[in-house]
Regions:
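PLP-dependent aminotransferase-like
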Residues: 65-152
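Phosphate-binding glycine-rich loop
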Residues: 30-74, 88-91, 98-100
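Conserved acidic
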Residues: 26-29, 33, 135
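Solvent-exposed, non-membrane alpha-helical residues enriched in polar/charged side chains
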Residues: 19, 23, 38-42, 61, ...
C-alpha cells in the first residue's frame, strides 16, 4: 500500500512571519508571537486561556497531567500512530491500552474502545491517520457516556 503524504503548504504570509521571527532572533518556542497567538486562539475557541507547546508530545503530556492521569491509570490509544501519542502516557506513569484499528480507515474501532474501558481508564486519545478522521461522533458518545475525557 502506498500512502500519499503532501509537502507543507507555506504561502507568502507564512514566509513573512518566519522572516520576522528570524529577524527578532526568536526562532523557538518563545518570542513575541507566542502570547499573541495564544490570545487569538483562546478567543477563537471561546475560552479564557490557551497554552501553546513546542510539540504534540508536550501538548498531550500537559493535558494528561492536567487531567490528573498518573500511575495505575490507563489511557486508550491506537496501535497505529506516531510514538508521540503514546510516550506521554508513560511519562505520567499510566499504562497505554491499545485498541485495534479498522484496516480500511486506520482508525480505532469505537466498539473496541468501549470494550477496553475499565475502572482505571482515565482518557481516550484518538488519532486521525493519513487524512482519515476517526468516527468522532461514536467516540464522543462513548467518552461522554462514561465520563472519560478525550484528547484530540
Amino acid at each position: 500500500m502506498q500512502v500519499q503524504l503532501d509537502a507543507p503548504n507555506i504561502g507568502e504570509l507564512e514566509k513573512q512571519y518566519l522572516c520576522r521571527c528570524i529577524d527578532s532572533t526568536f526562532v523557538s518556542t518563545f518570542g513575541p508571537f507566542i502570547g499573541e497567538f495564544e490570545d487569538k486562539f483562546a478567543r477563537y475557541v471561546g475560552t479564557k486561556r490557551a497554552v501553546s507547546t513546542q510539540s504534540g508530545t508536550a501538548a498531550i503530556h500537559l493535558a494528561l497531567h492536567e487531567l490528573g492521569v498518573g500511575p495505575g491509570d490507563e489511557v486508550i490509544v491506537p496501535p497505529i500512530t506516531f510514538i508521540a501519542s503514546v510516550n506521554p502516557v508513560t511519562y505520567v506513569g499510566a499504562t497505554p491500552v491499545f485498541v485495534d484499528i479498522d484496516p480500511s480507515s486506520w482508525d480505532m474501532i469505537p466498539e473496541l474502545v468501549e470494550k477496553a474501558i475499565t475502572k482505571k481508564t482515565k482518557a481516550i486519545i484518538p488519532v486521525h491517520i493519513y487524512g482519515n478522521p476517526c468516527d468522532m461522533d461514536a467516540l464522543t458518545e462513548i467518552s461522554e457516556r462514561y465520563g472519560i475525557p478525550m484528547l484530540e
